[in-house]
Amino acid sequence: MKALTKTDFNFPGQKSVYHGKVRDVYNINGEKLVMVATDRISAFDVVLPEGIPYKGQMLNQIAAKFLDATTDICPNWKMATPDPMVTVGVLCEGFPVEMIVRGYLCGSAWRTYKSGVREICGVKLPDGMRENEKFPEPIVTPTTKAEMGLHDEDISKEEILKQGLATPEEYETLEKYTLALFKRGTEIAAERGLILVDTKYEFGKHNGTIYLMDEIHTPDSSRYFYSDGYQERFEKGEPQKQLSKEFVREWLMENGFQGKDGQKVPEMTPAIVQSISDRYIELFENITGEKFVKEDTSNIAERIEKNVMNFLSK
């Protein structure tokens, strides 16, 4: 089992390449983006030292499926998926914020709430809430998009408008799309016996139109609970059975790592890497309702290059 942790392609018309935490994005002629979902994994804004076999394929295929399932809600950037790990799409000018939407109080929002804070991103929260409790209505809690190595910061709607990161009309559209996409994602998850707990969306503009970009409803951008037993676990104050990257974060925390300065990433043994890969496959199959078909990983970079070249030459 091989994992793709770095890419160095040179496609026809390539103007630039951006290496993100997980994806490598190639700009073709200033018109299209070739986005490669690598097998890198990040947590606490740090890229971990080992790649996770098949993770890129899973992320790319889940995102493609949900982009196709939401085109009636808003336009999105996807044009094609010429390789299981690649999406080619329209080049958009991204808004410098991530639209995070939460249906339940958990993760970083719970950690903030537990510390006594009752307002997140300008959204006031009532007293007396418990971990993993459902909000009466989903809340939107945006963050800034940090440069590599820096942490994303919470930001309120007021601050976004004040800093000119979006106009009032644009922000209204972003929020409307965010809530509608989350509603659709929640409905699809429910059909599979899952709860979509929280997720994030990224948007950009192309020719004056706002497009949904990047990934959607993947285990890297979302948190899912199993609905079966949710209520019982909640009432007993027990941890929920979840499908997300949270299990990676928990493993890191148990081993003394939270992304803080001076902390060392614990060794990722082959068994840990295998278990993370297995969890991702479990999530893929649960959320799509389809069997995961492992692609040939004998020479991933060569396969991607061939498939993308074929697509671009059309």
From Swiss-Prot:
Keywords associated with the record: ATP-binding, Ligase, Nucleotide-binding, Purine biosynthesis
Enzyme Commission number(s): 6.3.2.6
Catalysed reactions, as listed in the record: 5-amino-1-(5-phospho-D-ribosyl)imidazole-4-carboxylate + L-aspartate + ATP = (2S)-2-[5-amino-1-(5-phospho-beta-D-ribosyl)imidazole-4-carboxamido]succinate + ADP + phosphate + 2 H(+)
GO biological process: 'de novo' IMP biosynthetic process
NCBIfam families per the UniProt record, alphabetical: PRK12607.1, PRK13961.1
Family of this protein: Belongs to the SAICAR synthetase family.
Protein name per Swiss-Prot or TrEMBL: Phosphoribosylaminoimidazole-succinocarboxamide synthase
Lineage: Bacteria, Pseudomonadati, Bacteroidota, Bacteroidia, Bacteroidales
Gene responsible for this protein: purC
